[in-house]
Amino acid sequence: MVDKSQETTHFGFQTVAKEQKADMVAHVFHSVASKYDVMNDLMSFGIHRLWKRFTIDCSGVRRGQTVLDLAGGTGDLTAKFSRMVGETGKVVLADINESMLKMGREKLRNIGVIGNVEYVQANAEALPFPDNTFDCITISFGLRNVTEKEKALRSMYRVLKPGGRLLVLEFSKPIIEPLSKAYDAYSFHILPRIGSLVANDADSYRYLAESIRMHPDQDTLKAMMEDAGFESVDYYNLTAGVVALHRGYKF
């Protein structure tokens, strides 16, 4: 019998016990929740809004459908999906982190997004929904923080309806070498300083940079999605591969 307490994974560049990672990631997001939106704009120079807009455009979401915005954080995608599905549809904003979920709920209610949105604290590895529930699932800048990504992908596949699609928007591997070097310099030297100045938390943004480097590259993630059961999997490199959008279907 395997002693699960001895199984390890990565937390950034650190090797930690699998059972510890979720709590460590939770600490990061409890720490940054109040400055999350501000830091997203600063870190990406606002480009994250274009990446999310492209994800919305690729989602195929229509009026009356049911959408899961997983690791939905402060609700950027949920706000858009709420308008797209209308009164006859539903969006579930799910996040494992209570602080992020609270920020998302407050933000969306303040801008009038109510009525067709539900909020659920959920672990991506064991989604608390029946089989074949959602027409579309998105996970935006969240998969790299999941301890067992393969398990999470299988869980997402289970709760998708036949004909449904999963979209994974995540930091990836730059495809242009000079950009890769500049990106490394920015990530490891400038990003933690911004985190220190704005959020008073350099360590969390150092973890961000490290977690990006440990995340599977474009083709590896595509293969992982296929192994989980998804078909017709493809991906789009955005900003020369700094970010990639993967899309797969359940048939």
Swiss-Prot record:
Q: Which reaction does it catalyse?
A: a 2-demethylmenaquinol + S-adenosyl-L-methionine = a menaquinol + S-adenosyl-L-homocysteine + H(+); a 2-methoxy-6-(all-trans-polyprenyl)benzene-1,4-diol + S-adenosyl-L-methionine = a 5-methoxy-2-methyl-3-(all-trans-polyprenyl)benzene-1,4-diol + S-adenosyl-L-homocysteine + H(+)
- What GO annotations for molecular function exist for this entry? 2-methoxy-6-polyprenyl-1,4-benzoquinol methyltransferase activity; demethylmenaquinone methyltransferase activity
Q: Which residues are recorded as binding S-adenosyl-L-methionine?
A: T74, D95, N123, A124, S140
Pfam family, any one: Ubie_methyltran
Family annotation (PROSITE patterns)? SAM_MT_UBIE, UBIE_1, UBIE_2
Pathway(s) of this molecule: Quinol/quinone metabolism; menaquinone biosynthesis; menaquinol from 1,4-dihydroxy-2-naphthoate: step 2/2; Cofactor biosynthesis; ubiquinone biosynthesis
On whether Transmembrane helix is a keyword of this UniProt record, the answer is no
Q: What class of enzyme is it?
A: transferase
Instruction: Point out the signal peptide segment.
Output: none
What S-S linkages are listed for this chain? Answer: none
Q: Which UniProt keywords apply?
A: Menaquinone biosynthesis, Methyltransferase, S-adenosyl-L-methionine, Transferase, Ubiquinone biosynthesis
Q: Which GO terms describe its biological process?
A: aerobic respiration; menaquinone biosynthetic process; methylation
Entry similarity comment: Belongs to the class I-like SAM-binding methyltransferase superfamily. MenG/UbiE family.
Q: Which HAMAP family match?
A: MenG_UbiE_methyltr
What function is annotated for this protein? Answer: Methyltransferase required for the conversion of demethylmenaquinol (DMKH2) to menaquinol (MKH2) and the conversion of 2-polyprenyl-6-methoxy-1,4-benzoquinol (DDMQH2) to 2-polyprenyl-3-methyl-6-methoxy-1,4-benzoquinol (DMQH2).
Q: What is this protein called?
A: Ubiquinone/menaquinone biosynthesis C-methyltransferase UbiE
Organism of derivation: Escherichia fergusonii (strain ATCC 35469 / DSM 13698 / CCUG 18766 / IAM 14443 / JCM 21226 / LMG 7866 / NBRC 102419 / NCTC 12128 / CDC 0568-73)
